[in-house]
Amino acid sequence: MERIKPRTLSGFMELLPAQQQQMERVMDILRTTYSRYGFTPLDTPIIEASEILLAKGGGETEKQIYRFSKGDSDLSLRFDLTVPLAKYVALHYADLAFPFRRFQIGKVYRGERAQRGRFREFYQADIDVIGDGELDIMNDAEIPAIIYDVFSAMGLKRFQIRINNRRVLNGFYSMLGLTEQSGEIMRTVDKIEKIGPDMVRAILVDDVKLTGEQADE
């Protein structure tokens, strides 16, 4: 009988005991901090119906998910915690009190090429506030405080919190007289880490038809 060589699949992680203890400490800090700010813990299935996970993701999402069939069921492993949250709220809407403040810490799976810093199985630690109508902007302002408390409790001394808020951005674009182009501008600026500021500026000028001065601002 051929011997089977033990191995861990590429992009998946197994921790040694000391590393797992460190991981548990991080998880405890997250749970404690999130709970202190009034967020309720939530857990959702790792496996969902493919039609739910792919409802809004399009072809790019389909390339990333682990998808399989069991009998007549078309199933997939969750690739984030946001889509399962949307399903959960839609399913249990009548039983929830709004604004619904939840946190969820769990593994997600993405079938993309494993590389340094990018895994196929990894944890996400989400906090979300779901409103029944418009939410007070104070909910957005609270998030940086939570991040600061989490990182400080972990012993991190130097870190940056980058804020990306559509209301603030829309106000800025409105000030520049670019309200109609705001959606296209935001989609382009989101690519800045992938393609660099020079390419983003070129797209804003050539495709979105901004002036050079507007693109620089």
Predicted regions and their residues:
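Extended, charged alpha-beta segments that form solvent-exposed binding/catalytic grooves
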Residues: 1-217
